[in-house]
Structures are given as C-alpha cells and as structure tokens.
C-alpha cells in the first residue's frame, strides 16, 4: 500500500484510511474495538464530523490511549455563525480528547467562505489555527461548482468530495485540478453509497491516483478486515478489473443517490433518499 501526501498539509498516510460516519451506528464497546484494530493495522487518519452524533466521542475513547502525534484527526463543522463555529470546535476537541484537530473542515459547504466576506467564518478558521486548536483548513462539498470555487480560492488545504469509479469526467477533472494546485483530495463515498459492493475493485481504482486519499466507512469488524488486508496485498488495477469497472459504469453511472442523507429532512415528510435509491432497484 503506497503513501499519499495531502497537498500542502504535509500529512503522509497510507492510501487506505477511515471514514467515521458509519461508526455512529455501532455501540461504544464494539466501535472502540474496531477503531483500535484499525489503528493497530496501520490506519492512522480518521475523518469525522460534529454532525455525526457520537462518532467523535467514540474516536476520542478509542484513540486517546495512543500518542497523539501517531495519528491524524479530521473533523467538520456545519456552523453558520462565528458563535456556532467556536462552540462546535470546542465540543469536537472535548469529544476527541485532544487539544488540536489536524484538519478542520467546513462541512457540506454551500458557499466558499473567504476573508472579509461579511460572515466572519473564515476568520474563525484563522483564529483557531493561530491558537493551535487546528492545524489545517479544509472544506467538504457535494456540489461540483462549490468544489471548483474552493480550489480556485487558494484558501483551503484540502477538499473532500464524493469520488469513486462511478464518478463523471467532470469529477475526474476535479481531482486533476487539486493535483495541479497541490491541494489534498479526500475521497468520500468511495463505494458510491453502497452501489459498489466489491471493495477490492474500489481500492484498485483509487491506486491509479497519487493525490487521492479514500476514507472508507466501516461499521463491522469483517469490513475492516477487508480494508486491512489491502495494506499488505493491495489490489491492482488489472485489465480484468478495468473491464468490470466499464461494465459497472454503463449500468450505474450518471445521477444517482449516494446515500449521504443531506437532502433530508423533507418539509413534506417524504423520505427523499430512500425514494431515490429505490429508483435504482
């Protein structure tokens, strides 16, 4: 398994890391067991968010027994005001049992915050960084134009965006643009919200990019075992796998539900995400 350097952050980890959204669905004892097994197996980058209920708490419980400099924490805030930002950052630090977060990200951004834009939000990031509470400033997005604007701004060190072998050519260009600008690219939804069911194919696809860091959602020990097995024997993007991917693209690519749930709640009470995924059945 090769290493990835996340742009100007200088963070260097294996190209096979942990997305902690799904860990919120697991009871604390089991989640702690999974997280510590991940760490012991070579996973050293863990991505979470203030919005992921008790995910941060579980990470703090599991990882605080290890030297802090031996792993990286990325978290996120959906705050809309400086007051919310500061409160959420302090909560995240407490939950994670740490005095700093390696990458703090604006979560599911609908705008690219900038200095002097009147919101005070980017200034909050700068203040937190100056105070040593965060090390690097990142942004996560689900909209292509927001992601492009974030790269063009030159204000963010990392971009987190949905990316898998079902991604479009436009999303591939996003990866290329991040590389050109030495901006770290964190790939969420590497299994396309569950549409992709062969982890070895998903992993093999990612290995062709030297600037993409996939974070895999894990909630069962047997799932973790699959990802850890790739640390020693990394899947290769063979002609057979390429052909499989092309066939999958023909059947599944295009507009589809990744299962993120950010379309919810619906004011009319409609389960939008469930309806969207039923259309694929």
Predicted features by range, described:
Residues 1-71:
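N-terminal binding-site loop/beta-alpha segment at the start of enzyme catalytic domains
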Residues 4, 39, 43-44, 173-187, ...:
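Structured C-terminal cap/extension of enzyme domains
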Residues 6, 18, 46, 59, ...:
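Conserved, mostly hydrophobic/aromatic
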Residues 19, 49, 104-107, 140, ...:
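Conserved residues at the C-terminal ends of beta-strands
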Residues 26-29, 36, 40, 80-186, ...:
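Glycine/proline-rich, positively charged
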Residues 50, 54, 77-80, 107, ...:
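Short beta->alpha linker loops
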Residues 57-75, 123-132, 180-182:
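Alpha-helix-loop-beta-strand connector modules within alpha/beta enzyme cores
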Residues 70-73, 156-164, 235-241:
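Short hydrophobic/aromatic-enriched beta-strand-loop microsegments
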